[in-house]
Amino acid sequence: MQDEGPTSRVPRLISGELRESSYLCTQITPTTFMLINEIFYSLQGEGVHMGKASIFIRLSRCNLRCSFCDTEFDSGTEMTIEELRDAIAPYPGRRIIWTGGEPTLQLTEETVAYFKALGYHQSIETNGTRRPPAGLDYITCSPKKEAMQLLHRNFPDGVGEFRFPVGSPADLPPAVSELPPAGAYLLSPIFVGETQSEADKAAIELCVSHILEHPEWQLSLQMHKLIHIP
């Protein structure tokens, strides 16, 4: 029988509610709307898929507060899944990156299935404190101290890449043997300045030195900040 097309396979999302989580922050149960911080179309700026055209869907809310983060956590626009679908439809790229904030606070298995049925490849950028929903094509985990003891529980099958932001020796990662399996283990020197767009020479030197001593790691520069794109 001939396929009726992707739209016919889009599952209906169930309604949900906002409630308090027992761990770290507010979480959202499956719902027909999401709080969106911003949507933009650009190149993936770092990591294994650097340089690929991607639709960035930045979700509001986070359960951590990191000094180097470039996101305003709490503001955003409430959008239905259908409005979100229509907002990204004009972009020719078919790669979605769910980022934040901490996207696992809002992203559900139902939402992932919805966009998968529309033919999108979906990645997530997470801090590792919560298990991502099933169905994602790629997981980037940038673990924070609060998540280190949770990584094996939250990622029993491993991740696509671990990416550790590094600004000082205290930020250097544990041994690879202590982490779940990953396709790549990356060190990302932080950027500084008022707009966090200036390379930190000391952080770069620290990363390079660590990688030379531990060659299972590799360097991941934030290319989008170097060439000044979103």
Please report, for each region that a protein language model flagged, where it lies by residue:
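Broad hydrophobic/π-residue packing in well-ordered secondary structure
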Residues: 34, 40, 49, 56-58, ...
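Conserved AdoMet/S-adenosylmethionine-binding subsite of the radical SAM
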Residues: 104-230
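Flexible, acidic/Gly-rich N-terminal and inter-domain linker regions that tether
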Residues: 3, 10-56, 60, 65-68, ...
